[in-house]
Regions:
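Interfacial helix-cap and linker-helix signal at transmembrane-aqueous boundaries
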Residues: 31-32, 62-63, 150-155, 237-238, ...
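Paired small-residue
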Residues: 82, 93-101, 289, 300-308
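Helix-breaking motifs and short loop linkers at transmembrane-helix boundaries and internal kinks
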Residues: 67, 88-93, 242, 274, ...
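Cytoplasmic helix-loop-helix junction between adjacent transmembrane helices
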Residues: 98-137, 322-323
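C-terminal ends and interior cores of transmembrane alpha-helices
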Residues: 77-90, 285-297
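Juxtamembrane intracellular "pre-TM" segments in multi-pass secondary transporters
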Residues: 1-3, 180-216, 399-403
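Short amphipathic helix-loop junctions that connect adjacent transmembrane helices
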Residues: 26-38, 232-246
Length: 403
């Protein structure tokens, strides 16, 4: 199942999340020192997700037509440009523009990357594959802030932007030279796209639109959590426990670690019992962690709560990704993953904007509690999901035993 090409794709996913994560511990604190309010910081964080949200679906369609590699290289290139220009940003508006530029880069690379990973994989193996992919993805999410916090503490904030630039350039070069996509591959992609358009193929299989929509709502919950953590969690940790940049990076690292290592058991469970149950259980566990944020009486209690939130979210993510592949026509799979990714980014946009304003009105502690309640509401959409794995492996084994 894990081929050389998939290992390279996993490496590209790691580099994409590592580079952006390196910058995250410094961004909101730096913007706050330049005079940005909590709501302005929310806008800065949301600009990345908003740009990604607006570009992922058209870039997914473009990837189905012209091939995958060019879009991934282009995305890494835009991230490198944005990271370099951060050295010259001195106001909130300039941060917003650069976040948007980096978001366009992310919107270009992720649909193509995920489509390449899921191509030619049997449905009963998708959960484990996505679990392994998400483990690598979230290792980058966790290690980026940890490394970025250490860089900022020892070398200054400007050094984190240099590090992000180098990582993005490395990603572009690895994709360009390690992934082989021939002209005939691109012509075949274009031919499939033309045939799909001519046949007017539906993206979501008949009877599964409500299931697909409910899964996207739960996925959006993860986006809200990420934006909340990126925008307000560093400020909350500083206000409550006088956290240093290294301490903030450690909190984000444990969230990423939980996201990384609970994807594999989540993926295995997804292939064994189906998609619906892991989505529901994982999102509720994540909600328990978020509610614990507001009750944390010490830095280490907050550290544990953030880790629990990450673990729960990770357990549900492979099931949502596998469900998206299950219910969508293979000829429009990159577009489908565009919607999958867009739901996450919609959550990021709304989360950072809404909770930035909530924090200005009721304070950071009030915003934390409000987010916990919102997380519970979004998690309950999992109850509307219809099982998509035709015969979960555990049920199949039980049936064979009875026979």
């Amino acid at each position: 199942m894990i081929t050389r090409k998939i290992l390279v794709l996993f490496g590209l996913a790691f580099l994409a999340t590592l580079g952006y994560g390196i910058m995250i511990p410094s961004l909101s604190v730096h913007a706050h020192e330049l005079g940005a309010s909590h709501s302005a910081i929310g806008v800065i964080i949301s600009a990345f997700a908003a740009a990604q949200l607006l570009t992922q679906i058209p870039m997914g369609r473009l990837s189905d037509r012209v091939g995958r590699v060019y879009l991934v290289v282009f995305g890494f290139g835009l991230m490198a440009v944005a990271a370099t220009l951060y050295h010259f940003a001195t106001s909130a508006n300039e941060f917003i523009v650069l976040q948007a530029l980096a978001g366009v880069g992310a919107g270009s690379l992720w649909p193509a990357l995920m489509a390449m990973i899921t191509e030619n994989v049997a449905p009963e193996e998708r959960g484990r594959l996505m679990g392994a992919f998400n483990t690598v993805f979230f290792l980058g999410v966790g290690m980026g802030p940890l490394i970025g916090g250490l860089i900022a503490s020892n070398l200054g904030r400007s050094a984190v932007f240099n590090a992000w630039t180098l990582v993005a350039i490395l990603g572009a070069l690895v994709c360009l030279f390690a992934i082989k996509e021939t002209a005939s591959d691109r012509r075949a992609s274009a031919a499939r796209a033309r045939a799909t358009k001519a046949a007017d193929v539906q993206m979501v299989n008949a009877g599964f639109m409500a299931t697909f929509t409910a899964a996207l709502v739960v996925r959006a919950r993860g986006g809200v959590c990420s934006s909340f953590n990126n925008a307000l969690l560093p400020l909350y940790a500083v206000a409550m426990f006088e956290a240093t940049p290294a301490m903030i990076g450690s909190i984000m690292f444990i969230h990423g670690l939980g996201l990384a290592f609970f994807n594999i058991p989540g993926g295995m469970m997804t292939d064994k019992v189906g998609r619906r149950l892991p989505i529901l259980v994982g999102s509720l566990v994540a909600t328990a962690g978020v509610l614990w944020y507001s009750a944390a009486g010490s830095y280490w209690a907050l550290f544990a709560a953030v880790g629990l939130a990450g673990a729960g979210a990770a357990f549900s993510t492979p099931a949502i990704a596998a469900l998206a592949a299950d219910v969508c026509d293979p000829r429009r799979r990159a577009e489908a993953f565009g919607y999958f990714l867009t739901s996450f980014n919609l959550g990021m946009v709304l989360g950072s904007l809404v909770f930035g304003f909530v924090s200005d009105m009721v304070g950071l502690s009030g915003a934390v509690l409000t987010w916990g309640i919102t997380s519970l509401v979004l998690s309950l959409f999992a109850l509307a999901i219809r099982e998509t794995l035709a015969q979960p492996r555990g049920m199949a084994v039980a049936g064979e035993a009875r026979a």
